[in-house]
Amino acid sequence: MPCACNRNNWRKWIRPLLILLYALAILVTVPVCIWEFQKLKVGIHTKVWFIAGIFLLLTIPVSMCGILQHLVHYTQPELQKPIIRILWMVPIYSLDSWVALKYPKIAIYVDTWRECYEAYVIYNFMIFLTNYLTIRFPNLMLHLEAKDQQNHLPPLCCCPPWAMGEMLLFRCKLGVLQYTVVRPITTVTSLVCEILGVYDEGNFSFSNAWTYLVILNNLSQLFAMYCLLLFYKVLKEELSPIQPVGKFLCVKLVVFVSFWQAVLIALLVKVGVISEKRTWEWQSAEAVATGLQDFIICIEMFFAAIAHHYTFSYKPYVHEAEEGPCFDSFLAMWDVSDIREDISEQVRRVGRTMRGYPKKKCFPGDPDHNEHSSLLSASSQDSSKPSSPVGLYQGFGQTITSQSPISIANLYEEILNEIPEEQQRLYSGQDITMDIPEEQPRHDTGQDVVHLPYRQELPYKNHYQDHIQTVTSRYLLSSPKPSDDIVIDFSDSPEGSDSSTDS
């Protein structure tokens, strides 16, 4: 039974419902803040937490408005699903920092999960770009192969360039994916080190675990951002309709600013600007540094929410006729099967590469072809040299160049293999002639005719296109006038077949 609140009905009450929930949240949080200020002694910690709460209340509605509009106008799941995941970064960052600011003892546990989502956002931005390109250019691998070779950007400009095509796309995605894996691992490691008492957050010293984890996270994050930047550099013109610069800056600034300001605050602790002499209600200088970081993030997220609202706008996706039923878009927001499949595919490909197995071949005409499959075999391509646009594929078409000379006998065998076994036995040893009529085929007496739909691509049509030099094959591979059928005649007369072959 269809949902009673589908189409436009549920869109009429979803906005008032969220406004009501937001009003209830304000009615709960404001009295709590007032109660805190009614205490006999209100310190700097409480005042900072209260100011951060004001920015939180301003940030949440701006972010949720953008998320809600995408859910209401959920017409392009391939693009809007990663956008919604990116938009969730701002409220998660803001709420997480506000809670950590109020309860400093659990800050290490709360902040680590925030940092894990940071890696998730970077990868979703890469998915957003690749999904857009796949929609716009179904043969994306061919398009990349035809472009001029792109050298590495500084500081990796001395490294051998990645071959244009599948290798470039695979390594860029893998470079972003590694941060999605490294960040959760370092997060769990930091929690274990905190329990063991060897983490010592905010203290630059080679005797604690925090310093090493910061260096590892920094290198992993920088390489992920480098891969994103290289990917944008190669496909700058193709990505221009979605204005990727603003989107890239929104993601990059939130991630980079939050990370590097944490490093800067840690340096202030190291040089003594933030010291044990004045910690207010915090227990140590490191706790002061963590609280300062959380407070700044609460303020920054308000401006980030405004930037995200306009940069990742819902307006390009407003198509009333294509909007889905109730809750489908909401449930799709939590579906991570695409990420799981993509990670599994990347892991399998890395495993095949390490074991020396050849990569899977998947041609553009393959119905199972999608962005998670390897679209072009690069096993015969030198990874240190740029690929040529002329080779396995000619231009952007689907012509496949054969690597060995072809004879008429081979063509005969290929055609015969496509004929049912009964007719193979019946006409074994006879010559085959081909005819493509301009009008409807005529069924002559004494001939057996096998009809193949004209629009069905023959298996040998492309494979031998550049090698068969007979009149018959040239006539077959030319562009005939539209007709319903291609007729393959099995003639009993040897003279007809000889004339066809000799010509």
UniProtKB/Swiss-Prot annotation:
Pfam families: Solute_trans_a. The chain crosses the membrane at residues 17-37, 48-68, 83-103, 115-135, 212-232, 254-274, 287-307. It is a multi-pass membrane protein. Residues 373-388 have a biased composition (Low complexity). InterPro entries: Ostalpha/TMEM184C (IPR005178). One of its GO terms (cellular component) is membrane. GO terms for molecular function: transmembrane transporter activity. Residues 494-503 have a biased composition (Polar residues). Belongs to the TMEM184 family. This is Transmembrane protein 184C.
